[in-house]
């Protein structure tokens, strides 16, 4: 199960089944979707599109008068540097646009994405991301040196270039470690991302730089237990504008402060005093926070803000209200 399905479908609907007594059946195998007994369901919810079987399944739902909701958390037009660009352009982009157009309702993560989706469907509801803090991945405890950390995937090569020559002087001055989480040793792009941080080839990796290998969506959260300050650089692009603020929430789960590029969608958290907005690519404020000895205090502020504005119970109520409205 990928991260999107885990956060947008699995986590919220497991809790909905428990809290609301609503029966939720889950299928993650596309090969079985064509044979599902759709007539037994009041509503179908899926992320983005239904893959290769979409144009077989949508007519079945229409014939049986079963409403469906599309949950989407990012833009369907990828930048050319994204590893999935060609595949999306050839096979996925138009499928997503069609699913949005025919959906009875669409759930999105941010006002920015709501604006874009309304080009295809006016029945759009903002359902922000939220984490279930009771999951074990958000409860790990570790002993570690003071650490600045980044957690992410392969598509962030261009974003990490924003940290070039920025992290090294901070780590060396304050004796901090930098931890890159999501790493895969034999993938060339990761070597590029590492060099963007260290300025050195892998065989000259400095002592202050360490990595953690990529893992499953229900396990990666534990990496935040090794971090004291998070960073989330993000290029100002149309694609990134329609992403969500999930990295801020993940940092908040471990009561960590986070430094983010001052671009949308991160600026949706402009009132979050546990989140620092980096302008003109000047990351030196990280050092000032370390020196102030208020790292934990500011991390607590991030947690309190996210618990108020991205509370899973509150957001799930909104989710259930929409489900009931669509079902009628």
Where do the model's predicted regions map?
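Carbohydrate-associated surface elements
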Residues: 112, 130
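N-terminal pre-catalytic "stem/leader" segment of glycosyltransferase-like enzymes
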Residues: 1-50
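Nucleotide-sugar-dependent
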Residues: 158, 206, 210, 214-224, ...
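A short beta-strand/loop micro-motif in the catalytic core of glycosyltransferases
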Residues: 44-45, 101-110, 179
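Conserved catalytic-core segment of nucleotide-activated headgroup transferases in glycan assembly
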Residues: 1-21, 131-136, 141-225
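A charged, aromatic-enriched C-terminal amphipathic alpha-helix characteristic of glycosyltransferases
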Residues: 12, 293-324
């Amino acid at each position: 199960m990928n991260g999107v399905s885990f956060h947008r479908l699995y986590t919220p609907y497991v809790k909905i089944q428990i809290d609301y007594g609503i029966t939720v059946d889950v299928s993650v195998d596309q090969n079985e979707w064509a044979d599902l007994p759709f007539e037994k369901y009041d509503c179908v919810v899926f992320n983005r599109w239904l893959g290769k079987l979409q144009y077989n399944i949508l007519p079945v739902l229409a014939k049986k008068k079963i409403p469906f909701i599309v949950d989407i958390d990012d833009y369907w037009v990828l930048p050319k540097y994204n590893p999935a660009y060609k595949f999306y352009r050839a096979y996925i982009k138009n499928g997503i646009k069609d699913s949005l157009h025919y959906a009875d309702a669409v759930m999105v993560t941010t006002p920015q994405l709501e604006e874009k989706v309304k080009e295809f469907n006016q029945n759009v509801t903002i359902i922000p991301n939220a984490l279930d803090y009771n999951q074990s991945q958000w409860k790990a405890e570790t002993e570690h040196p003071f650490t600045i950390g980044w957690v992410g995937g392969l598509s962030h090569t261009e974003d990490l270039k924003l940290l070039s020559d920025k992290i090294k002087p901070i780590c060396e001055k304050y004796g901090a470690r930098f931890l890159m989480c999501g790493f895969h040793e034999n993938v060339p792009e990761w070597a590029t991302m590492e060099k963007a941080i260290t300025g050195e080839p892998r065989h000259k990796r400095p002592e202050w730089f360490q990595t953690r290998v990529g893992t499953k969506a229900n396990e990666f959260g534990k990496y935040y237990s090794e971090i004291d300050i998070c960073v989330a650089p993000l290029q100002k692009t149309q694609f990134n504008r329609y992403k969500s603020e999930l990295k801020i929430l993940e940092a908040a789960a471990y009561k960590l402060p986070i430094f983010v590029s001052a671009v949308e969608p991160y600026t949706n958290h402009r009132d979050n005093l546990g989140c620092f907005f980096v302008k003109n690519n000047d990351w030196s404020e990280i050092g000032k926070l370390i020196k102030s000895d208020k790292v934990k205090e500011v991390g607590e502020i991030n947690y309190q803000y996210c618990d108020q504005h991205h509370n899973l119970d509150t957001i799930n109520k909104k989710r259930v209200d929409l489900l009931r409205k669509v079902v009628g």
